[in-house]
């Protein structure tokens, strides 16, 4: 496959339309930025904003454009290197080839394949039949196009997306077998995990219900710390976090999920190994002291992060987007033309 990129490509999506919280920061923003810094130079890093994916389930469209630009700014505030020529940031909808290739690949995809997708099953069961869109059903085909247009070999995804990587490999192999060498085959999921390595396994939980992950679905907002929260208000949320009646600090996710969550948050905010934090507090009886330490670390983190956010130059961000989109359009259009010629419409 002809590709204007001379380096192998790593591709991943930036969250488009959700208000981001500290769980997103440590679970997605920071790992993504660390990955980009670690591999830029040897690899081309494609970071795209999946705005077409963002409304496969119902959203408030009046907020979408603002959220897209805000979240892009958040990634830059977290350290995304805009000045690195190997790092490309682009909006999915600004590359028409994503949609055009999706229409083509739909005709080479079986309904049965889509019906077997566990993420579709999970989301559709929660939404109900009258709210399930064709876009949600077809999500894996668009995701395959996101990958195949640029010859991406490595795509860091969670377990919930692994099935989509395997589908991407299947459709690439199917098209290559029938029409020749059209697509670069992304590596199998096992090799993806080997390449990116295993994460440290720390997952921030809801402050009020530490048995579940921190999520925007908490309507009260008391269990979530958003990156946009007032630092002092966030510290108060920490002080009001649910704990237990055991009366002694231990790291035990089953019997003391609230205390364990606070220990994890402190480790993440201070960049200390969790074992060191646990050793410092284990066996102590003052939950208040632990909460105070976490609250102070939270306030300090948000104050610094929001200062960085305020200093992000949006003109520079928009210039980076436009430059990346120009480059990506050239690459994607070449791939699309190869496919169009192969199937006989050019």
Which positions does each model-derived feature cover?
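N-terminal Rossmann-like or analogous alpha/beta NTP/dinucleotide-binding catalytic cores
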Residues: 2-11, 16-145, 297, 306-307
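Pocket-edge structural micro-motifs
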Residues: 12-14, 91, 151, 208, ...
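Short, histidine-centered active-site or binding-site loop motifs used for metal coordination
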Residues: 14-16, 51-53, 153-154, 218, ...
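Short amphipathic alpha-helical interaction patches enriched in hydrophobic/aromatic residues
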Residues: 18, 56-59, 152, 245-246, ...
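Structured ligand/cofactor/substrate-binding pocket environments in proteins
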Residues: 20-27, 44-51, 60-67, 91-98, ...
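Short amphipathic alpha-helical segments at helix-loop
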Residues: 56, 149, 153-156, 309, ...
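Short helix-capping/linker segments at secondary-structure and domain boundaries
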Residues: 111-115, 149-156, 267-277
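Conserved nucleotide- and phosphate/pyrophosphate-binding catalytic cores
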Residues: 163, 169-346
């Amino acid at each position: 496959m002809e590709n204007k990129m001379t380096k192998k490509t790593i591709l991943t999506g930036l969250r488009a339309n959700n208000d981001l919280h500290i769980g997103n920061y440590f679970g997605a923003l920071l790992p993504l930025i660390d990955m980009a810094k670690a591999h830029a130079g040897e690899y081309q890093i494609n970071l795209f904003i999946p705005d077409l994916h963002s409304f496969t389930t119902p959203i408030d469209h009046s907020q979408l454009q603002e959220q897209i630009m805000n979240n892009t700014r958040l990634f830059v505030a977290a350290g995304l290197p805009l000045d690195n020529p190997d790092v490309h940031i682009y909006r999915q909808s600004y590359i028409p080839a994503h949609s055009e290739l999706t229409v083509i690949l739909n005709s080479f995809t079986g309904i049965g394949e889509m019906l077997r997708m566990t993420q579709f099953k999970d989301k559709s069961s929660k939404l109900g039949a009258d709210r399930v869109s064709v876009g949600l059903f077809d999500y894996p085909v668009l995701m395959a196009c996101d990958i195949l247009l640029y010859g991406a070999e490595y795509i860091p995804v969670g377990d919930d997306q692994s099935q989509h990587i395997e589908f991407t490999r299947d459709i690439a192999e199917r098209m290559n077998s029938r029409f020749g060498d059209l697509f670069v085959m992304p590596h199998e999921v096992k090799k993806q995990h080997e390449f990116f390595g295993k994460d440290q396994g720390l997952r921030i939980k809801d402050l009020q219900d530490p048995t579940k992950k921190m999520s925007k679905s908490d309507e009260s907002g008391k269990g979530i710390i958003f990156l946009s929260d007032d630092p002092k208000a966030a510290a108060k949320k920490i002080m009001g976090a649910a704990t237990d009646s055991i009366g002694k600090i231990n790291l035990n996710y089953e019997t003391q999920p609230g205390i364990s969550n606070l220990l994890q948050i402190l480790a993440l905010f201070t960049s200390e190994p969790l074992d060191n934090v646990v050793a410092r507090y284990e066996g102590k009886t003052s939950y208040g002291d632990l909460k105070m330490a976490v609250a102070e670390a939270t306030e300090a983190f948000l104050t610094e992060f929001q200062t960085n956010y305020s200093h992000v130059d949006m003109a520079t961000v928009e210039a980076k987007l436009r430059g990346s989109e120009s480059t990506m359009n050239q690459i994607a259009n070449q791939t699309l033309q190869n496919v169009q010629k192969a199937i006989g419409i050019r």
